[in-house]
């Protein structure tokens, strides 16, 4: 009968050890799931933060491009106004030169004809 008690004790100890191992595995799996969930939450919050920073950066720098465009356009308009003013001053001289050239042709031999 002592053999039966010894075997029963061993079986009971094996069963308890199996339960302890099962609990440890379940605990580890639960911890892994919790860690994955926490990591996903942290990643989402980090992504939201970076998206917010990107939007702020875009808004901050989008206005700068508009200002540069306005300055460039003003510079171009100023240069065009200056060119038109110079053209208006020189218009009479150009017309005189054209009329003289048409009325008084000069006979020259072209350099390729020689």
From Swiss-Prot:
Pfam families, alphabetized: V-ATPase_G
InterPro entries associated with the record: V-ATPase_G
Disulphides: none
Gene3D superfamilies: F1F0 ATP synthase subunit B, membrane domain, Single helix bin
Parts of the chain that traverse the membrane: none
Family that this chain belongs to: Belongs to the V-ATPase G subunit family.
Subunit structure: V-ATPase is a heteromultimeric enzyme composed of a peripheral catalytic V1 complex (components A to H) attached to an integral membrane V0 proton pore complex (components: a, c, c', c'', d, e, f and VOA1).
Name this polypeptide is given: V-type proton ATPase subunit G
Gene for this chain: VMA10
